Amino acid sequence: MAVKKEPAWVTMGDRVSIWVVTIGALIVAAFILVSFVVTTVGQVSSGEIHFPVFTDTAVPAGEFGQDRGLTAATYTEASLSATGLSTGVVATFIAANAVNTLVALIVTLALAFMGWRWLKGDPFRQSVIYSGIAAAIALMLGPFAALLLSTTATTRALLEIAGPKEGRSDLIFAAEFNLAPFLAGVGLAIVLGIFEAGQKLKADTEGLV
């Protein structure tokens, strides 16, 4: 049975680097999973939820030295801790955290799988493409789902804690989305598409020879 080997340009340093990345990805994945389990168990057992909210609270300019030219200041975010929230709100917070955890696990495990296939001498197997596609989809869709869940949970939690806004300006019902994971997913999908097209072109060319 023929054994596939890396190209001649793959050095020992490359192999060491791939080993480090592969093992590192597995360690990170394990840490992420354990962290999620510990956090979830803590939230369920204590009933206490920690979450950030946007604020628009004025800060007395004198606290920062008004004589130096500062005329106004505001807090833009606050970290809240609350107990006694309804089961639905707690479950929604946990679901949002679960989605973020799942995205991180898919990406890190895909990276570890790619490294493992390379170390086995078969980095271009179709399963590697599939794992990359899974990571790209997770990066593009996961953050949107997590944002929807966390925003819903935060809004419901604020309503339970403070009631309707009724003209207050200290708590803001808003959300912030980071486009970096989505763009990373798009970039990964493009790279995988180009790679797949190149593989098919190579196969077609070899078939003509």
What is the predicted role of each segment?
Residues 23-57, 132-150:
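Hydrophobic alpha-helical membrane-insertion segments
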Residues 51-71, 98-108, 143-148, 196, ...:
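Alpha-helical transmembrane segments of integral membrane proteins, especially early/N-terminal helices
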